[in-house]
């Protein structure tokens, strides 16, 4: 299939003026080889301290990825320290995806699937602009998003709520609006996960996952999505630890294991397919290089230079920065990394920085004063927009028993069976269903947590609510309704309430829990466990507000059994 019929002419996403071009060339030409090597790295921080930053800044990295804790002042101080210590301004990056990984001092917004469930591009744009503006207040220049994977394999724990859904046309429409809004507000967007995830239910944090499509199928789906968004000017793409064997074998028919090479170290996927066929002229960043999909493929000393040599311009994260810096330098000396690729990558890195205006910002002015930051975060307008999106996203999947709306007169005594899920990142928002219980009590309900030693009965319970809240999460392998944990033991996991007591399943995470609970007659998908969503869900359960969410995926997992 020819891509010419699918994609607009590629644009130059990193176009800069002559003054900026001169800065790029002057800065690059003044660098030593060691300084150029440093520019290839984006190191990660999570402690917001000068002590943590010191060894990283000594390597003069091109970027710093921020996973903040909950102290805005410490976060700002660490950013200022990094800026002050740098000769070449570092780019600040982040996984800015919403949901329960929203930053603690920023406005809490639904995750990407929650935004898609609003089924309204104006809402998508409003949330994207809100996120971009607050990200700029926090000093972020580059968001590692949005995810443009197609959520086809419902058992995948890593795509799910991080995606815009399973329908390619919706993914493209939503991502187009989201990227335009981010970049118009001064934040570089990033398409991920190249060459496309969502058809393998495994997680590249643990294994090299596989895009199983034929070449023609890929062109019609991911080729169209990436081609269109590249044509619209997205600045960066994240090359992931995902194999695309059909494309490799189209060029190397006898490929064996090499057909399953991660894109991160694949010249064919990064250079030939992404750059030459799709015409991408922006920056390619690797996915996190500590993930199992890459660490399981080849030895680290070979991996480090191979990532850059095979088409990535920046190397994301390191558990041993000094060691990996040494591996990159050794790779240049022993020929695993060519001078041409080093020169090309550093030029593109500096061009991205110039495109974002970092070359002309006074370091003393890059981070606004702390009080100004506080005033610009969680503004009333932003809170209203986020609350509206939170409510708009909540989706009634089914209510075949006509349980809703709930009322204290009929369902006063409520047993709560809850699993809060976990966060990959220590600084993520705290989890808990306290707001749900508070909202129920305020309306006259009497909620109590399940006592696994005293099973609810018709005589003492009017309603059972299952509250589950695991969003798509790295390294989770699979997300499912864990009845052993919910009910307290393997034996009790076999007991079910749905046919004895009115029961409802409320998901504040993945939208596929019905697969493990086909006999649940009432199901609501709310996509994230942030406080506005928790409170707005109760309003919809009681009929105070309508369910308006439109599921971006098939919550019935293609199984007729789940519909009844």
Walk through the language-model features, giving the residues of each.
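Glycine-rich tight-turn/loop motif centered on a GG-T
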Residues: 62-69, 108-123, 155-174, 203-220, ...
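Conserved, mostly hydrophobic/aromatic
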Residues: 32, 64, 95, 120, ...
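Short, acidic/polar
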Residues: 44-57, 124-134, 218-228, 298-304
């Amino acid at each position: 299939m020819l891509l010419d019929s699918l994609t607009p002419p590629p644009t130059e996403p990193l176009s800069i003026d002559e003054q900026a071009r001169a800065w790029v060339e002057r800065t690059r030409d003044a660098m030593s080889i060691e300084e150029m090597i440093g520019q290839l790295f984006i190191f990660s921080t999570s402690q917001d301290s000068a002590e943590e930053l010191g060894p990283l800044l000594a390597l003069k990295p091109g970027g710093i990825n921020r996973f903040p804790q909950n102290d805005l002042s410490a976060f700002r101080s660490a950013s200022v320290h990094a800026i002050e210590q740098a000769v070449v301004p570092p780019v600040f990056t982040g996984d800015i995806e919403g949901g329960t990984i929203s930053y603690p001092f920023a406005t809490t917004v639904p995750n990407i699937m929650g935004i898609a469930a609003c089924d309204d591009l104006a809402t998508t744009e409003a949330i994207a602009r809100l996120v971009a503006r607050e990200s700029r207040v926090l000093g972020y220049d580059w968001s590692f998003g949005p995810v443009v994977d197609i959520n086809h394999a419902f058992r995948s724990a890593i795509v799910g709520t991080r995606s815009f859904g399973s329908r390619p046309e919706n993914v493209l429409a939503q991502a187009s609006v989201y990227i335009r809004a981010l970049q118009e507000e001064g934040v570089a967007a990033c398409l991920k996960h190249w060459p496309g995830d969502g058809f393998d239910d495994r997680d590249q944090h643990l294994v090299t996952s596989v895009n199983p499509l034929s070449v023609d199928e890929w062109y019609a789906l991911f080729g169209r999505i990436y081609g269109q968004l590249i044509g619209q000017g997205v600045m960066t793409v994240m090359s992931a630890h995902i194999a695309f064997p059909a494309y490799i074998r189209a060029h190397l028919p006898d490929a064996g294991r090499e057909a399953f090479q991660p894109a991160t170290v694949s010249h064919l996927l990064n250079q030939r397919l992404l750059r030459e066929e799709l015409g991408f002229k922006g920056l390619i960043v690797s996915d996190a290089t500590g993930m199992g999909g890459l660490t399981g493929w080849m030895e680290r000393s070979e991996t480090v230079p191979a990532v850059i040599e095979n088409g990535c311009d920046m190397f994301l994260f390191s558990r041993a920065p000094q060691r990996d810096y040494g591996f990159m330098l050794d790779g240049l000396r022993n020929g695993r990394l060519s001078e041409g690729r080093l020169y090309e990558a550093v030029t593109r890195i500096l061009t991205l920085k110039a495109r974002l205006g970092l070359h002309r910002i006074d370091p003393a002015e890059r981070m606004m004063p702390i009080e100004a930051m506080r005033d610009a975060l969680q503004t009333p307008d932003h809170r209203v927009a986020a609350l509206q999106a939170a409510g708009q996203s909540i989706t009634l999947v089914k209510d075949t028993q006509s349980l809703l709306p709930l009322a204290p007169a009929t369902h006063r005594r409520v047993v709560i069976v809850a699993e809060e899920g976990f966060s990959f990142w220590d600084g993520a928002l705290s989890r808990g269903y306290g707001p749900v219980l508070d909202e129920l009590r305020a309306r006259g309900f009497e909620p109590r947590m399940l006592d696994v030693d005293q099973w609810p009965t018709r005589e003492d319970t009017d309603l059972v609510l299952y509250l589950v809240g695991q969003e798509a999460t790295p390294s989770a392998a699979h997300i499912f309704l864990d009845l052993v944990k919910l009910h307290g033991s393997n034996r009790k996991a076999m007991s079910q309430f749905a046919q004895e007591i009115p029961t409802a399943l409320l998901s504040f995470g993945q939208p596929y829990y019905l697969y493990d609970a086909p006999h649940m007659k009432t199901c609501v998908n709310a996509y994230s466990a942030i406080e506005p969503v928790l409170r707005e869900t109760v309003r919809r359960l009681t009929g105070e507000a309508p369910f308006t969410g439109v599921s971006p995926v098939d919550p019935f997992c293609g199984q007729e059994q789940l519909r009844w």
